[in-house]
Amino acid sequence: KRGFNSEDIERYNLGYCSEGPYNNRVIIPSYDSDGKLNYFVGRDFYNSNFKYKNPPFPKDVVGFDLYVNWSLPIILVEGVFDAMSIKNNSIPLFGKTILPKLYGKIVENKVKDIFIILDSDAFDDAIQMTEKFVNEGISVNFVKLDGQDPNDLGYKKMITKIHNSLPMDFKQ
């Protein structure tokens, strides 16, 4: 349904849990830069009222760190499926705000360019994030989705939106 192929399933090491606390959930693992599991998300396979189930430990991690090239522009998105649909240097926030470890890693690695792609209900969060990064000297592009979701738009349309986005500053 989400448009992922066997290469995506293999790359992201997706799994399925058929019993236990994550019964009937697709498991989306996240790995740190050394390839060690640092977090995971369980997504209900049958679209119940409780779509996502997170593990009972803090999510202050760098999502999909294993796949990030810190010398290239990075793309910050809300969820794991958004990141997987964009693929290239895309990091899930596991929510609408940036947590300390990810923020620290961005600054530590002297990332020069960031694209922020959040749902329209997270506009204020995106502005706060943008301001923090601009104050660090990082160029930030805010990608407008017009009520759509990166996963719904698909890879090609998202890449077009990213390329057509403009840098933000607080002088305008």
Predicted stretch roles:
Residues 121-122, 131, 147:
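Thiamine diphosphate
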Residues 79, 119, 145:
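Cofactor-binding loop segments of dinucleotide-utilizing enzymes, especially the Rossmann-like FAD-
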Residues 1-27, 31-34, 68-69, 104, ...:
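TOPRIM metal-binding catalytic domain and adjacent DNA-binding surface shared by DnaG-type primases
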Residues 76, 112-125:
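Acidic beta-strand-to-loop metal/phosphate-binding motif
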Residues 125-137:
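Short, aromatic/basic amphipathic alpha-helical patches
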Residues 139-149:
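A generic structural motif
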Residues 18-113:
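Phosphate-handling DNA/RNA-contact segment within nucleic-acid enzymes
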Residues 25-26, 107-111, 151-164:
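Short, surface-exposed amphipathic charged segments that create phosphate/polyanion-binding patches used
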